[in-house]
Amino acid sequence: MKILAGGCRVYSPEDGQISTVGNWAARTVICRDTGAKRITQTASEYTPGVSPAIVNPNAEEVLYVTAGAGVAHINGFAYPVRPGCAVFIPPGAIYHIENPSTEKLHIISCCCPEDPECHIVETAVTSSGEPPRLMVHEEDRDPIRAGKDRVFRYLVHTDLGCEQVTQFAGWIPPGKAPFHFHTYEEGIFILEGRGIVHVDEEDCEFGPGSSVYFPTGVRHCVENPGDSTIKLLGAFYPSGSPGAAYEND
């Protein structure tokens, strides 16, 4: 992990504390212990089988599938997932992940605010009727321009019932944006491509699997010096628009 001015942090794919329960291995990257205030980011890996069921009593959680396929079970309802699927876990919902494949299932999650009361539950949950809309695929979202040449798509947003967190996918073409800041706390996971984070007079390179934490109000710039597009997964708290950026002198 490299700490930049204003508390911005850039994490390598090897950073984070790993915990394993059953077929679920979780690497917690962004959290209070690593410098964040309220937002978290965890990279989870599920081997074949059914994971333990967990609940966040007080926090919203958003998931994004980066590789593999399986089923997210939420309060007894089943949601088939594949790469590009985003899932909303409401506060108090009991959920677990099923991986019926021989391949590993990879998920990036963000929980806001960090919930110290998160715990494993033993009780099985069953439900009937029409499942609530808690999942969307990025291909089902319209592209939205942010600035002159950058594009994002909402993933988990208010239409899925999420009130505190905004999750999005973003694409950064070659080039360098102006320095700017946001009025929210943000965590980013790099899905594809390589670039540079600039904060004041400091900078740090990143690549696939890296994570970046931006505190509220810190002026920064993400540069793409290469010839291919960077794809990133972002989440921020409180909820809003990824295109809302503010520039000053």
What are these regions (language model features)?
Residues 58, 77, 93-94, 103, ...:
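A generic "binding-loop/recognition-motif" signal
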Residues 88, 102-119, 213, 227-245:
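A short hydrophobic beta-strand segment most commonly corresponding to one strand
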Residues 1-38, 116-165, 247-249:
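A short, N-terminal "cap"/entry segment at the start of jelly-roll beta-barrel domains
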Residues 58-70, 75, 183-196, 200:
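Glycine- and acidic-residue-biased ligand/ion/polar-headgroup-sensing regions
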Residues 76-91, 201-217:
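Short acidic-glycine-tyrosine-enriched beta hairpin
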